[in-house]
Amino acid sequence: MRFSEGVRRTGPLQSGLCQLEWLAYQTGDPGLFPIFSWVVAVPDGLSDEAVSGAVSALLLRHEVLRTRFDADGDGRPRQSVHESVHVAFPRVEGEDALRRFTETPFDVASEPPIRFGRTARGDLVLVVPHIVADRGGAWILVTDLTELLAAQAQHRAARLSANAPQPVDQARHERESGRARVESSLRHWGNALQDFPVTVFPVSRGRPGADVVRADLESPAAGLALATLRRTLATAPASIFTAAAYTALAIQFHRDRLGLNLTWSFREHPTTRGMVASLFRDMPLIVDLRGRPSFSEVLRRLQKAVLVAGRHMSFDVLEFHERAGRVEAERGAFLPGPESISCTLEGIESVPAEPGGDPRALLADSRVSTSRSNDSWDACNLYLRAYLVEGRLHIDSAIDASVVGDRDSAGLVKLTEAILVHAAASGDLAFGEAESLATDPWRPGARWVGVDGVWVDLDFLTERLQEHPAVHHADVREEHGRLTAYVSADLQPWELRDFLLSTDNGRNAVLSPHRFVIRRTDAATVTGSGVDRPMLAPEGAAEQALKDAVAGANELTDPTMAGTYLTVGGRLHLVPRVLSLLRDSGFEGIGVADLRSPTSLVALAGRLRQRCVRTGGRASHAPHRDRGAPVTGRRATAGDEAGRQPIEGEGKDV
C-alpha cells in the first residue's frame, strides 16, 4: 500500500490514545497498543473487481485510512489526509503468513495506515494500527466493509449514513472552540489526582520484566446475572460489572478506597459516535467503599463518580499526562504500569432474564483457565475486561506476577462472578455476604501500614533505601499516619526521594516517605520531604548533553538537573526532539517512559550510554560519560546556599 496522490488537507491530531501511539511511533517504537486485524467474509461468487470496489468505497468514506501521521513545524502531532491510496491485495495463506501479515508494524508517517490481504478462500484480511482506531472505531470499519461487500453482491446501494464524521474535523474543534473545556478538565484533574490512590495492590517489591498472570473466566451464570441486574436496577451493564469488580478488589486486597482507569470512549456526541478514530482515553475513577456498603450502594457511589469524572473528560491526552506527571513528582508516588478496567457488553439485551431465573444454578457451568504472557503490550499492572459471547460473560484479568499468582488471579475473576450472581439472585448483596464469597483474600503482615489509602510494606522501603551506596543505615516507620524515613547518609532529602522514585520496580508502584530525617557523618541532622529541589548544574558529558537536549527542544533557559523532565517545563510532544538531539550529541538509552516518570534529569543521565558511530567504515564511540554512579551528595549551583532552593515553576488507485 502507498499514497498515490497529494495531500488533500491537514490538521492536528484529535485527543485520545492515538496521541500516545503517535509519540511511540515518533520515537521509533512500533506503537504501544496491539494492531487490530479481522478476516472479513467475502460473499460467494463476488468478483475481485467488486471486492476492490467495496474497499475503494471504504477508503473514500473514512479519511483516516488515507492519512499519514507525522509532526508539524512545532513538533506537534499532525495528520495529513491524502487524495487516494494505491491498494494491494496480497495472498495470505497459512497461519505463519497470516501472523506476519497482521503483526508487521506500520510506518504511519510515510505509508497508509491500513493493510488488505486475501485468504486462500478469497476472504479479506483487514489490518489497522491503533493510531487509526480504537476498538469501537475498528468495529465500525468491519461493519462498514461487511455492508459494502453485501451491497456489491446484491447489486444495491450500501445502507450507510450519507456522511461519516472525520477525525480532522474533531481535532480542529478541540483545538479551537473546544479549548475552554480542555483547560477546565485539566484544572479538575490536577486537583483530583492529588487524592488518587496510587495503586490497587499492596506497595511492595516488584520484579522488572515479570510475566503477566492471566485468568479467563467464561460464565453463563454471570451473563444471566448481568442481564437480570440490568432489568431490576435499570442501570447500564458496564456500571454493574464495574461495581462488582471494585467490590471484589476491595475485598481481595483489604481496601476501602480504590482508583482505577476506566477505558472510556469519547463518543457521547453525534459528531463522534460513528467516527473511525482512536478516541478512547482513560477515565480515572475513585470509588469510596468505606462503611462496608452493599452492592447497590457501591453501584450508586460508582455512578456518582462516573458523572463527576465524565464532566471533565474533554482533556488533551498528552497535556493530561503532563499534568499527572507533575502531580506524581509532587506527591512522591508513581505507578509505571496502569491499572485499568474495560467493558464491552453489547448484546446484553438479547440475554433472556425472566423473573425467577436463578443464575446460581448455572455456576457449575463456569470455566476458568490461567496462563502467562510477556508481550510488549503487557504494560498494565492490572487489566480487567468483561465482554459477552452468546450470552456468556467473559471476565479476563491480567495482573503483574510480582503481585499475584495463578490462584490469586483466578480467585479475583471468580469473586467478581460470585458477587454478580448472588446480587442478582437476592436483589442486592451486603458487604459481609460479599466478603464470605472470597476464598483467600490478601491480608497485611506485621510490617505493613495503611497510608494514603494504600498498604505499604515498610521493609520494602527500608531495604530499597539501603540499596543506595551512600546510605549506611535506614529505617522507615509509620508515625501519625505518615511515613518517616530515618537515614544515616551524607545526602539531602531530595536525593533519597529521587532515588526511590527512579528505581525500577517493574510495573508496580513506587513511593517515597513523607519525611526524611537524615543523620550526617558530621553529626548534623537534615530533615525534609524532598519535594523542594535545588538548582543543580550538570556534571560530565552525559548530564550536559541531556540538559542541552531538554533545553534546546523545549526552549528552556536553564533547567535544573534536580528536576524531572515535566517539572522543569518539558513537553511530551517534544520528547522526539529531545531524543534526536541526544543522539546527535552521541548518547542514547532513555525513552518516552523515562521522561514521563518522576525521575530527575541527573538520574536519567545516569541511564545514558554512548552511541556507536560509524566513521570511515570503522566503529568509534561517542564521548564517554565521566561517571555512572548514583547521585551521592551533589553540589548545587552558586547562589543556592543550602542546596535546597525550590524550583519555580498494491494495485489500484482509490
Identify the role of each PLM range.
Residues 62, 66, 142, 256-263, ...:
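Extended, hydrophobic beta-loop-alpha segments that form or line the acyl/peptidyl-thioester binding
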Residues 5, 30-50, 109-127, 205-269, ...:
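Gly/Ser/Thr-rich phosphate-binding loops and adjoining beta-strand/alpha-helix segments
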Residues 26-31, 59-98, 115-120, 152-181, ...:
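Small-residue-rich loop/turn and linker elements
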Residues 1-28, 52-95, 164-212, 610-654:
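Short amphipathic alpha-helices and their capping loops
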Residues 3-4, 26-35, 52, 63-64, ...:
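His-Asp-centered acyl/peptidyl-transfer active-site segments
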Residues 2-80, 93-176, 308-319:
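Acyl-group handoff/entry surfaces in thioester-processing enzymes
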Residues 2-3, 43-60, 76-111, 224, ...:
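A short, small/polar-residue-rich loop/turn motif at beta-strand boundaries
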Residues 68-69, 145, 149-165, 190-199, ...:
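A short N-terminal helical cap/helix-turn-helix that marks the beginning
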